């Protein structure tokens, strides 16, 4: 006979890996072409001048310049890259 009760099982004990979303280059910082500016889920912030968007909604710099955040059409946030 067992001297202790069985441990049983649980349906918990899992966790997903972190996705590291958010702003990677702050407003006013100088970036090179191809630099990731921010990672997001969905198009919360849209790309503006000299900024591109990836298939996972990542915004990146198309040219060297300074990062600026602003409100665009319909008060939507936008990221621009202003040439120095």
From Swiss-Prot:
A Gene Ontology biological process annotation?
translation
Xref: Gene3D superfamilies: 2.40.50.100
Keyword flag Cell membrane: no
Q: Which GO terms describe its molecular function?
A: structural constituent of ribosome
The protein's UniProt keywords, in alphabetical order, are: Ribonucleoprotein, Ribosomal protein
Q: Which superkingdom, per the lineage?
A: Bacteria
Q: Does the entry feature the keyword Transport, yes or no?
A: no
Instruction: Kindly give the Pfam families that the UniProt entry links to this protein.
Output: Ribosomal_L27
Any GO CC annotation of this UniProt entry: ribonucleoprotein complex
Where are the residues of the annotated region Disordered?
A: 1-21
* Entries under HAMAP family matching the protein: Ribosomal_bL27
Q: Which family does it belong to?
A: Belongs to the bacterial ribosomal protein bL27 family.
Query: Could you identify this protein by its name?
Result: Large ribosomal subunit protein bL27
Native source organism of the sequence: Chlorobium phaeovibrioides (strain DSM 265 / 1930) (Prosthecochloris vibrioformis (strain DSM 265))
Taxonomy of the source species: Bacteria, Pseudomonadati, Chlorobiota, Chlorobiia, Chlorobiales
The gene name on file is rpmA
């Amino acid at each position: 006979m067992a001297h202790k009760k069985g441990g049983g099982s649980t349906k918990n004990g899992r966790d997903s890996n972190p996705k590291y979303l958010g702003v990677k280059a702050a407003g006013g910082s100088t970036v090179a072409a191809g630099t990731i500016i921010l990672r997001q889920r969905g198009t919360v912030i849209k790309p503006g001048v000299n900024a591109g968007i990836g298939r996972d909604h990542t915004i990146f710099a198309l040219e060297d310049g300074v990062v600026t955040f602003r409100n665009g059409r319909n008060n939507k946030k936008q990221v621009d890259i202003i040439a120095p």
